[in-house]
Amino acid sequence: MRRTGTMFYSALLLTGANLALRMVSMGFQVYLSGQIGAAGIGLLQLVLSVSMLAMTAGMGGIRTSAMYLTAEEVGSGRWLGVRRVLSACFLYSFLFSTAVALLVWFCAPLVAEAWIGDLRTLAALRIFAAFLPVVCLGGVMTGYFTAAGRIRELVAVEILEQVVSMAVTVLLLSHWASGDPGRACCAVVGGSSAASLVTLLSLLFLRSRETNRLPDRQEAPVPVAGRLLRVALPLA
């Protein structure tokens, strides 16, 4: 009964935090529209559409896979198994996301010219491509923290991510973009990318602190690669 109540309050906290962050994000979108104008917003929406497509491909179902496999290991009390799951998920995510990132990087001129129709978006697309593996590795850690029930820490990091994203974006818009739509797109993508890096580093730091407190005991190795592929590939 106690565990059920904890799960309920964790889900409630995560839902409430996500709603609050979405409201803040909507307010920030209003600010952006006033800063970069209709032309900048139009270009930004096109860049974000391409980015979301690439991010979906780069994730390759790894966030859900990390959450599912971590939950299995935590439920069985296999703490070394959790380490193996995270290692396998990191390797899978890095390879998958790097392949997609390279594709976006080298196809960015074609996408900017033929699909978006504006070469000013080229730099923004390449900034996104450079940080795509960081975003996807952050997805692995998010899946782990969700499965491990460490919702409060996850919410705190998500709030930090939002603050960093807005702060870096505002800084770049006010001191560098100077009303240029192409630079404005770079500012927004750059702010989001910097926030993703902060998120990944924060979650890795929290995970390292947890690792130092785990019991040191022998466990029979449980195969991870096959389980990961069975879960991740259908979601890719």
Positions of the model-derived regions?
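Interfacial/gating helices of multi-pass transporter permease domains
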Residues: 32-53, 120, 185-186, 226-231
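Small-residue-rich midsections of specific transmembrane alpha-helices
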Residues: 45-71, 93, 130-136
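N-terminal membrane topogenesis motif
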Residues: 1-24, 80, 84-87, 220-235
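Alpha-helical transmembrane segments of multi-pass membrane proteins
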Residues: 117-141, 167
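Short membrane-interface helical motifs at transmembrane helix boundaries
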Residues: 99-117
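Helix-terminus/linker motif at the lipid-water interface of multi-pass membrane proteins
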Residues: 23-41, 112-114, 176, 236
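Membrane-interface junctions at transmembrane-helix termini in multi-pass inner-membrane proteins
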Residues: 135-157
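Membrane-interface helix-loop junctions in multi-pass transport and translocation proteins
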Residues: 148-153, 163-206
